[in-house]
């Protein structure tokens, strides 16, 4: 289920963006509207269903997720070119689906027995690395040579597999628990600065690499390379770069080097972004994506490690792990919401100065991420 979700996300994060740009004559506003509605709905969904997650019948919610996934792509198939006028509706349905998915499926993962989790994690990582390289080329080739509709047929196959899997899952080993207590958890955030800082790191993640940066990168790639095939090839190449960066991190990087790594990778990202803004060409696009692939990978791995360290603080692990991870997700999505609000402003930028001012805001987001990541790393060293 998780691998299929990741496969579909590759399509929506890159090739749906390309489709919107093609339909709107390279107007990025529909992309921004889609994501604003999507992340607003994710936040609302995760907040409103938080207590349903602690009841035993979560499998029903998981099946709703798969149904919404089908509705999302069915609308794309039915409306075709007119879907550009309903970007908000797609965002609404996509946000509802994703908010339910990450809320429910994270709990399923947390209930995997410890003896089996390493095997599960290893299999997922291997499959995820494989699809990150192969799937973009497949979608890019199909979209360029056969059209967007043929891509949707492939997606429908994945969705039907998800439907079958959802009826295999059962509510096993998921006992009823107490309701989520956000009021008490907020008091923990006020009293423990490290816990609060870990949430700010998640917020900064939403502002940058897991936010509008992904769409921004896609827009610039399309601006230069034009076709879905080129987008697919580049996405696959930089997936390989990401895998290489992960290998280096796992085998060569020591914990004492983390702060230097955060500073260096974020500094180089800013330099590469400025270069791409001032001179958008093949070389600046490749340079930025190369640097960003390393920076994003290192930031994610370092911050994920620190997030897990904080989750095992006595004040959290005894009673508030559910609240801790739920709020981390919410902070990420709040960051993404702000990030895409800034992204939407680019659609109204009618001169170079306006564009540059908005891009400076993204640079400030990167600097903020660097600062909070370093502070949390120092606390956990």
Region annotations inferred by a language model:
Residues 17-23, 50-51, 133-152, 223, ...:
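Transmembrane alpha-helix termini and helix-breaking/packing motifs in multi-pass membrane transporters
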Residues 1-40, 194-236:
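Helix-loop boundary and gating motifs at the non-cytosolic
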Residues 45-58, 143, 245-257:
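Helix-to-loop junctions at the C-terminal end of transmembrane segments
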Residues 94-127:
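Cytoplasmic helix-loop-helix junction between adjacent transmembrane helices
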Residues 84-101, 283-300:
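Hydrophobic core of transmembrane alpha-helices in multi-pass small-molecule transporters
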Residues 33-51, 236-248:
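Central cavity-lining transmembrane alpha-helices of secondary-active solute carriers
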Residues 67-82, 267-281:
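C-terminal ends and interior cores of transmembrane alpha-helices
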Residues 171-205:
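Juxtamembrane intracellular "pre-TM" segments in multi-pass secondary transporters
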